[in-house]
Amino acid sequence: MPAREVYLKRPATRRQLEGICTRYDGQQRITQLDCEEGCSKRTQPPQRLNPRYKSPDLIHISFIIVLLCILSMTSSVVAQTTTGSSSSKAAATPILPRQTLPTTISLPPLNISHPVLQLALPPTSSLYLTFSICSLTSNATILPTVLISTSSPASFNLGSKPIRDASTGGIPTSSGGKGYNYKSGRNGATWGLKWSSGFGNWTLNGTSETQVHLLLGLGLGNDGSTLNTTGVGNGNVVVQMGASTSGPLHALSAVYPLLGDTTSTSALIFSPLLYSSPQPEPSYPNYTLPGAQLAFPDFSYSEPLNSSLSSNLTLIVVPTNASPTSTDLGNSICAINAASANSSVSGANNTILKSFQPEWMTVGDEQGFRSYWVLGDLAEQGNYTAWVSDDKGVLSQPAWFATKPAGFPCQLVMPNDVCPNLGYSAPLDANSTAVTSPSGATISPTSPIQTLPDDLLELIVQNLEAFSTSLLSHACGRDLFSHVSSCLDCYSAYRDWLCRIVVPQCGAANSTSGATVIETATSTSTSSGTFPTPSTVLRTPSSPRNPSLPIPAYSYYELLPCMSTCNRADRSCPVSMGIRCPKRKVNAAKSYAFVGDDHSYGDGSAAQGVAAQDRWGNRWCNG
């Protein structure tokens, strides 16, 4: 079938919008879009035209309409000419007008009937392209090949020995990706896009204007001409492309949402650490420790963030069985948005509580600012996938969590000014304040506990004040105290230990069938496959953890504190403060969780090889 040429036609007047002129077998067909006058029917050679308008407000919308019309008309044409040379294909390639940049568009679908698409971008010295796979065919293993050329004429032959090219894009494995893009040799001008779970990117940073050509295909070989559509499957592959000359419109962050904890129908989720803000170290001679009730600093929007995410975040949560991660599209923002549109459990109808700006806390063993969300009306023992995205187009890595079984008795407790390390379920009386959605439906019959009960609060405050008074009698702020820690380190470690002992964390009933010691662990907690089994023990009103503390009115399984919480306080504080931790081979298993009998390994700290939580926030001990 002879190839068709598609190009933009220059208008006769500045007020006109260009027509799309198509020449096929020497006969020209003209499709007009809002032309004030008829388009000329003279045969015109293909050319790239810069549109002119009196009304700048219409430029962006008008050119997107033109581009989409061009692409929809040419996708089938290009697919039928894939056996031709690269140069001949480029001659009939539609050009994205410069005025549409920056823009995000969904390209015409690729399928068994139309497996190839080619287009060109306007000459530029700087270009940032991002790609997301919105959907796959019935054969989810077939990903579209994306070849990029800056040569003239375009050549899409990647060669038999392409090299990695980190300078143009791709996502390194250290950031949750699958590697960098490929390039056709050190001085080559052809690149192959490397997909990372449905996301890819490519960047041009040159010194002179260059025209960029793209060739996308299903079953397309790296030579840009071999096409094998066997096994492509039914349905469409849809790719969303973002193009800009000033910076990428979409990006991936290597960080994850952090799970606080779940109940049977609710979940507490924190953002990644946005801004690290350790407590300021006092100095001698005016060495003063923080009060029992901390004065939290305000979040400063002018401070540089520790995360590639901005502070304006949106939480996205969908059931895992409806998640694009099931087809390895967990980094595709358009696939995630489609799943969220159909199955979201993180919208207004599921939100019990959320922060309006980042707040200071010490969850995740890090001092600094995070945002949080509490979701309700979730399924019992449900599996969910979560992301956070920001207003700059940056997407986090996906995190997975599960809700507890029916009958789970404990309540979610939020970080507060006395115990900023909380953020989990605890055996406290329920806050019976019901939460309803904007439509009036009940999201949850209870609310998270934001202030501790008076008896627990008074107990913690009294202990902190007494400990502070005793600690300040030492040589705080002077070399005589310690070469490795300070009085503030000691006081902070004691606060962390005290809060976890007085406000224990609840665990699931089926964790270890009552066992309190984990015998083996072969890896750090960053590997979910070898993550230690949560260490829980049954607590009842008749056999509480500590009879001198307020006793819950119901039975629950306690997730034991990590041995590291006691060890940290022991190491940081003077011997005279009297902090002593139990021995592993003696009686430590009654009160603390650890791995093995070697005191130098597995206490729940990252320094000892098995951190308390994995990268998503799932814990095997409370620490």
Curated annotation (Swiss-Prot):
Keywords: Calcium, Calcium channel, Calcium transport, Cell membrane, Disulfide bond, Ion channel, Ion transport, Membrane, Transmembrane, Transmembrane helix, Transport. The keyword Ion transport applies. One of its GO terms (cellular component) is plasma membrane. Residues 600-623 are annotated as: Required for targeting to the cell membrane. The chain crosses the membrane at residues 58-78. Residues 79-623 are cytoplasmic. Disruption phenotype: Growth defect during endoplasmic reticulum stress induced by tunicamycin, fluconazole or ketoconazole. Sensitive to conditions of low calcium. Sensitive to oxidative stress induced by hydrogen peroxide during conditions of low calcium. One of its GO terms (biological process) is calcium ion import across plasma membrane. Residues 524-544 are annotated as: Disordered. It is found in: Cell membrane. Residues 524-536 have a biased composition (Low complexity). It is a single-pass type I membrane protein. One of its GO terms (molecular function) is calcium channel activity. Residues 1-57 are extracellular. InterPro entries: MID1/Yam8. Its main location: membrane. Pfam families: Mid1. Calcium-permeable, cation-selective stretch-activated channel (SAC) that functions together with CCH1 to mediate calcium entry into cells. May additionally play a role in cellular detoxification of radicals. Forms an oligomer by disulfide bonds. Interacts with CCH1 to form a Ca(2+) influx channel. Interacts (via C-terminus) with CCP1/cytochrome c peroxidase; the interaction may contribute to cellular detoxification of radicals. This is Stretch-activated cation channel MID1. The lineage of its organism: Eukaryota, Fungi, Dikarya, Basidiomycota, Agaricomycotina. The gene is MID1.
